[in-house]
């Protein structure tokens, strides 16, 4: 598997299942093998991505996992389009913290033309101030006209996750289909936006279904694969549904994704702090990307803590110049001490008077 991975070739479905079903005793050997592939294509670099939540909550979609879904009782912050100055401040905090890519996200089915123009203005402003920083946009479903407009404004990438396998999708969401999502990925590709599309592991899918979606993403030629692990928000249908997720379970999935997408950006995304916990440094041996700071509606690790983890592992933040300006309180993050069903809700950054976490 390793030799094929070094040539940029994917593993087979059978090999992928073997990794997922391997014993915990084999984990370190699997990580070491996947790590050779990761370092071959990405050396010791780690790409830091930074999320900016432009519009939070009140989404008309009914995705079962989502704290922003229709009918969600999760006690998250809800706000319409954020003040441009607050967006600017959050972006500056993320870049100062070492972010290589800024991800601008808004809840909802998809943007109106007015919404697209609003976000395009933010993209142009960011690119004018920081031409070397990549911009990823995530606004839901878009057609060719809107995708082309976002690309013309200067966006580099667009995130639209598959989330789970086609065969499992109806159990997770009823307001749109898996096909709708993958059709959107093709729209992005046609219009020159780098497609970022990944999964949420731990939503009741079988091993076979997890393999199906990962291989389908390869078939669609996505450039970046964020791997999230279910955050079981209270007030959502999947609350309490993450008891089976262990650090070893997560690491096997990350390793399998690396072997399936050897030369793609693989990101340990939401849920890594809560589910991989003290074994997060091992994840860096497999993935080449993480999020810096907070997520859309939940808190992430303190920026300084993640940067220290990267340095301690012998890795280098990609694109960071000199000493990043980050918070110094590396003990402020407490997710590792929380039970798996207690999701730390975000109460800082956009929507509050508290500075962003970066």
UniProtKB/Swiss-Prot annotation:
PROSITE patterns per the record? RADICAL_SAM
GO BP term, pick one: biotin biosynthetic process
Sorted alphabetically, which keywords does the UniProt record give?
A: 2Fe-2S, 4Fe-4S, Biotin biosynthesis, Iron, Iron-sulfur, Metal-binding, S-adenosyl-L-methionine, Transferase
Annotated catalysed reactions: (4R,5S)-dethiobiotin + (sulfur carrier)-SH + 2 reduced [2Fe-2S]-[ferredoxin] + 2 S-adenosyl-L-methionine = (sulfur carrier)-H + biotin + 2 5'-deoxyadenosine + 2 L-methionine + 2 oxidized [2Fe-2S]-[ferredoxin]
How cofactor binds (record note)?
Binds 1 [4Fe-4S] cluster. The cluster is coordinated with 3 cysteines and an exchangeable S-adenosyl-L-methionine.
Q: EC number(s) per UniProt?
A: 2.8.1.6
In terms of domain of life, where is this protein from? Bacteria
Which residues of this UniProt protein bind [4Fe-4S] cluster?
Answer: 59, 63, 66
Query: Which pathway does the UniProt entry assign to this protein?
Result: Cofactor biosynthesis; biotin biosynthesis; biotin from 7,8-diaminononanoate: step 2/2
Q: Which cofactor does it need?
A: [4Fe-4S] cluster; [2Fe-2S] cluster
Entry similarity comment: Belongs to the radical SAM superfamily. Biotin synthase family.
Identification of the protein by name: Biotin synthase
- Protein species of origin: Cutibacterium acnes (strain DSM 16379 / KPA171202) (Propionibacterium acnes)
Q: What is the lineage of its organism?
A: Bacteria, Bacillati, Actinomycetota, Actinomycetes, Propionibacteriales
């Amino acid at each position: 598997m390793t030799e094929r991975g070094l040539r940029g070739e994917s593993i087979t479905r059978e090999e992928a299942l073997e990794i997922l079903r391997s014993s915990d005793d084999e984990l370190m050997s699997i990580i070491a093998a996947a790590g050779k592939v990761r370092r071959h294509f990405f050396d010791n670099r780690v790409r830091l991505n930074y999320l900016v939540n432009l519009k939070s909550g009140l989404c008309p979609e009914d995705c079962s996992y989502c704290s922003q879904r229709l009918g969600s009782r999760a006690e998250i912050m809800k706000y319409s389009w954020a003040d441009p100055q607050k967006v600017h401040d959050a972006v500056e905090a993320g870049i100062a913290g070492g972010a290589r890519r800024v991800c601008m996200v808004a809840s909802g089915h998809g943007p109106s033309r007015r919404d697209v123009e609003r976000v395009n203005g933010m993209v142009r402003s960011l690119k004018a101030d920081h031409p070397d920083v990549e911009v990823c946009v995530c606004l839901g479903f878009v057609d060719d006209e809107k995708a082309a407009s976002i690309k013309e404004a200067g966006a580099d990438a667009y995130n639209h996750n598959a989330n789970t396998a086609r065969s499992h999708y109806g159990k997770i969401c009823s307001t749109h289909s898996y096909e709708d999502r993958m059709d959107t990925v093709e729209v992005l590709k046609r219009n020159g936006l780098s497609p970022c599309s990944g999964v949420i592991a731990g939503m009741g899918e079988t091993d076979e279904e997890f393999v199906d979606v990962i291989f389908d993403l390869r078939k669609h030629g996505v450039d970046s694969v964020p791997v999230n692990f279910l955050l079981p928000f209270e007030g959502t249908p999947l609350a309490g549904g993450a008891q089976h997720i262990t650090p070893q379970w997560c690491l096997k999935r990350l390793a399998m994704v690396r072997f399936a997408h050897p030369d793609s950006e693989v990101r340990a995304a939401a849920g890594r702090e809560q589910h991989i916990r003290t074994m997060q440094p091992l994840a860096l041996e497999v993935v080449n990307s993480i999020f810096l700071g907070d997520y859309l509606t939940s808190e992430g690790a303190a920026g300084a803590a993640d940067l220290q983890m990267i340095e301690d592992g012998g890795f280098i933040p990609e694109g960071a110049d000199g000493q990043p300006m980050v918070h110094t309180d590396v003990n402020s993050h407490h997710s590792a001490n929380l039970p798996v069903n207690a999701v730390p809700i975000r109460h800082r950054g956009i929507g509050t008077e508290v500075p962003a976490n970066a």
